[in-house]
Amino acid sequence: MDIAARNPLLYDNVIYSLHFYAGTHGMELRNRAEQAMKEGLPVMVSEFGLSRADGDGGVFLKECDEWLEWMEINKLSWVNWSFCDVDESSAALLPGAAEKGDWNCCSPSGVWLKSCLRRLNAIFISL
């Protein structure tokens, strides 16, 4: 992002994508993104996970809470990786979860995500 901020695309309707994994990326990446936003780049978090970048290694709740707070402060849209039942830490569903839904099949990552969505939805609805 910092590189893009020094030489931004000169087109209308452009947004820059930020990917992070809470177990791998931290303050250094947030600082680079903040600098890019200060320089005028529009940013969206188009992929993030609660795990390491390889999709595994456990769920890093404290780090994800820090990232979520940062995204809220900076009013960034975000998309979580991944809504699947693969046997890895980043998956929101437990292996073998029902295809048609059953929010009781959430992995630790999914439990955190579900809680965030409920909290943020309650804030949005109360506006």
Label each region the model flagged.
Residues 1-77, 92-112:
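Extracellular glycoside hydrolase catalytic/binding regions
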Residues 82-87:
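Short, solvent-exposed turn/loop segments enriched in Gly/Ser/Thr/Pro and often Arg
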Residues 103-127:
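Low-complexity, Gly/Ser/Thr/Pro-rich intrinsically disordered linker/tail segments
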